[in-house]
């Protein structure tokens, strides 16, 4: 019999952390973060990282594990998450995976086809080609090879364009083809929940209020500290995180403070929309929870889990 795991998914600002804390007070669970922004040290305000008080109530694994100069893949996450899940299960507890990075959940459930290691010669050739023709031209080339990846990648995102083309040149297969090849399935029985306000206008308001709150808490100073390091740039996954990119561009002088706030809020709302689109198209059953009814949401999880474990 496989051990049990709980997935608590949802868009940004939906109340996942609050519910996770409530569940930890009632269930023998340990929390694993499923968030591609919370992995970075020194990025606390703009990622809405759980506070010290919240972490005292519900410690989160897989947060603050990398410097912002480092990259982290879905495969890295799968390896790390499986290790943490095994540790939690060995303690007789249930892994509670909480977050909104849907690609990480997908990788965990379905496994991943191993991607080739970087080839410095191919990368150098692509960078030389980009210097002559521009990254937009390479993005056009990618669109012919792998239209699905090209649609997801911004024409100015040199790092991701380079990687997608590099994978094709090494393997002869597109990144989309390779990522659709299944790897090892998750060795757990898992129950999936998604939390969001039933009224989407509430989510939009929460996102706007939270972004303004981040500004009040010192988000600009947090990014200024990263900006001053000198070894970070806007093409790194950490700086491309929602909010950080907009603040970074503001610090570069690309637009004024008011425009930065507007763009940051818009980008966060777009992220929430993408997350909800992922969830609506999810292949396996999800129990939806209304974050405007937190007590009811908690009771639904407890009731559902109890009936699930009884079979």
Swiss-Prot record:
Region (Interaction with substrate tRNA): 35-38, 159-163, 240-245
GO molecular function: ATP binding; tRNA dimethylallyltransferase activity
Chain positions recorded as substrate binding sites: 12-17
One Pfam family from the record: IPPT
UniProt xrefs under Gene3D superfamilies: 1.10.20.140, P-loop containing nucleotide triphosphate hydrolases
Residues holding ATP: 10-17
EC nos: 2.5.1.75
Keyword Lyase: no
Residues the record marks as site: Interaction with substrate tRNA: 101, 123
Domain of life from the UniProt record: Bacteria
EC class name: transferase
Keyword terms: ATP-binding, Magnesium, Nucleotide-binding, Transferase, tRNA processing
Signal peptide: none
Family from the record: Belongs to the IPP transferase family.
Function of the molecule: Catalyzes the transfer of a dimethylallyl group onto the adenine at position 37 in tRNAs that read codons beginning with uridine, leading to the formation of N6-(dimethylallyl)adenosine (i(6)A).
Protein name: tRNA dimethylallyltransferase
Organism annotation: Haemophilus influenzae (strain 86-028NP)
């Amino acid at each position: 019999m496989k051990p049990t795991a709980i997935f608590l998914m949802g868009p940004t600002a939906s109340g996942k952390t609050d519910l996770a804390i409530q569940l930890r007070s009632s269930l023998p669970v340990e929390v694993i973060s499923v968030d591609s922004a919370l992995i970075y040290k020194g990025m606390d305000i703009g990622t809405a990282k759980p506070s010290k008080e919240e972490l005292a109530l519900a410690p989160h694994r897989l947060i603050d594990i990398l410097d912002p100069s480092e990259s982290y893949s879905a495969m890295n996450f799968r390896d790390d998450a499986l290790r943490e899940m095994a540790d939690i299960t060995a303690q007789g507890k249930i892994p509670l995976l909480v977050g909104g990075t849907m690609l990480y959940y997908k990788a965990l459930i379905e496994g991943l086809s191993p991607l080739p290691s970087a080839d410095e010669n191919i990368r150098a050739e692509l960078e030389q080609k980009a210097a002559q023709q521009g990254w937009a031209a390479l993005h056009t080339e990618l669109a012919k090879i792998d239209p699905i990846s090209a649609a997801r990648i911004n024409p100015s995102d040199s790092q991701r364009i380079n990687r997608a083309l590099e994978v094709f040149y090494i393997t002869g297969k597109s990144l989309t083809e390779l990522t659709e090849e299944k790897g090892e399935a998750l060795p757990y029985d898992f129950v999936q929940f998604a939390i969001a306000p039933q009224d989407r206008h509430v989510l939009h308001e929460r996102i706007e209020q939270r972004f303004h709150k981040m500004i009040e808490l010192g988000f600009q100073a947090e990014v200024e500290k990263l900006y001053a390091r000198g070894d970070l740039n806007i093409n790194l996954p950490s700086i491309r995180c929602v909010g950080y990119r907009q603040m970074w561009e503001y610090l570069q002088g690309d637009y004024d403070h008011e425009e930065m706030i507007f763009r940051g809020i818009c980008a966060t709302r777009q992220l929430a929309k993408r997350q909800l689109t992922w969830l609506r198209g999810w292949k396996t059953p999800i129990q939806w929870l209304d974050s405007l009814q937190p007590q009811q949401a908690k009771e639904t999880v407890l009731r559902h889990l109890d009936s699930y474990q009884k079979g």
